Amino acid sequence: MTRRDWLGLLSSLGIAAKASAQTAKPAAPTGPKIEPLVLSDTEWKKRLTPAQYGVLREEGTERAGTSPLNGEKRKGTFQCAGCDLPLFASSMKYESGTGWPSFFTSLPGAVQTKRDFHLVLPRTEYHCARCGGHHGHVFEDGPKPTGLRYCNNGVALKFVPEAA
């Protein structure tokens, strides 16, 4: 393989990786059609706290163990803090020991995934299907029945208790 071939191959791989990282696809093909919520950066900053903005709009990560939602055990729904879309039922939550609220699945059609190469090794990142807000990453070390762990930034969620 010549140097030119080698450089061409590396360039192609880089372009393919970037395209893969930017392509969002639904995590589940089922569920109701969700109308997108598109706001300007200024509108998001008015709507969200600085911590929420940092995670939801800038794909940041909150410190492990800091979310009050880690200990949330009531029946209810975990919604996107950016747009109120229900993402997880409380029955989907489990204690992962990671310091972040964790779920073994999401509500149908509620999240979209994409490949994330920020830490060099690819990971699966997930976003709210309505507003595109970053919530966390999906790992393949969760409990049955899915074997998945949706590791969520608590600041990106709000909990709505089930009506009594």
Regions found by a protein language model. Give the residues of each.
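N-terminal secretory signal peptides and thylakoid transit peptides that target proteins
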Residues: 1-14
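Generic structural signal for short, solvent-exposed loop/turn connectors between secondary structure elements
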Residues: 1, 29, 162-164
